[in-house]
Amino acid sequence: MNRDGKGVYKEENRKPTLPFFFKLLWRKLSQLIRLNLMLMVQAIPILVLVYVYLAGYKTATATEMLYAPLYGISKIAPVGGITALLDTQSIQMGIPIFTPVMLIVLICLGVLLAITFGWFNAGSAYVLRGLFRGDPVFIWSDFFYAIKRNLKQAFFMGLLDFACIAVLVSDFIFFYSRTGSSYGNDVMYLMIFAISIVYVIMRFYMYQLMITFDLSTMKILKNSLIFTILGIKRNVLAMIGLLLLIVLNAVFIVMFLSVGITIPMVLPLFYIMAVMGFITTYAAYPVIDKYMIAPYANDNVPEPTEETEASEISDKE
């Protein structure tokens, strides 16, 4: 049987340090590229939605609830106090304008993305876990094996995940457009920003926990939140790595576009999603192993209690 990539190297020190990350990344790069090409099927609706929002026609719309009544009062009684108050409530936000056909297409793309979101994440999480652990990995078959094994839970987890991301992104855009208008809006913007960071880190663990253990969705979310603290060192390094990856790609695109070269705009489509997933898996799985696998690997260790919630853990491997 031919293996899709190499397994564990004998006598190799696989301690998940920063130097070993680059060594393993280089070793698994070809497999990550193949995985990324599969993930592009999921990325196409996202790219279309982002492009339509950024490039489509927008109309400036006032977002403050007091704007309309204050505007009416200012027309009837244009006194200085009302005019000054109206100025503070005149923050505008660009609202996209869609034709009926375009709106139907976007809704269909959004529904398709929401339905398949959890399945793609479950499949990629399983493959990335295998690449990190040095298991023999068959990209195509392992990807769909994970989806089949977690079909129902991945579907509902994906819907919940997609809804949370959609709410956080829309809230972030909304309150970002209103920063500086009032103290309350500034506080809400900072809160949404902080919650978004926490949720991004939770996503490092959510699908890894789902494919590895037999846990309820609520326990997965709870443990993922706990791991944002327990693995804070690795989580921060992973966030820095993701930020550097995005910034470096953006810099290269801008640099080459300035001289008329468009290739850097296409190259990230071949690797960036899988590499980002590899970074998060490299950060998250050692934390999961430390707290949920290693303590119970020895048969002599007492059975876990309800307090640790590990009594409900059953390895899916």
Show where each model-derived region lies:
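Alpha-helical transmembrane segments of multi-pass membrane proteins
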Residues: 187-196
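Membrane-interface helix termini and inter-helical loops of multi-pass transporters
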Residues: 174-181
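Helix-coil boundary and N-terminal low-complexity module in membrane systems
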Residues: 1-173, 185, 202-204, 209-239, ...
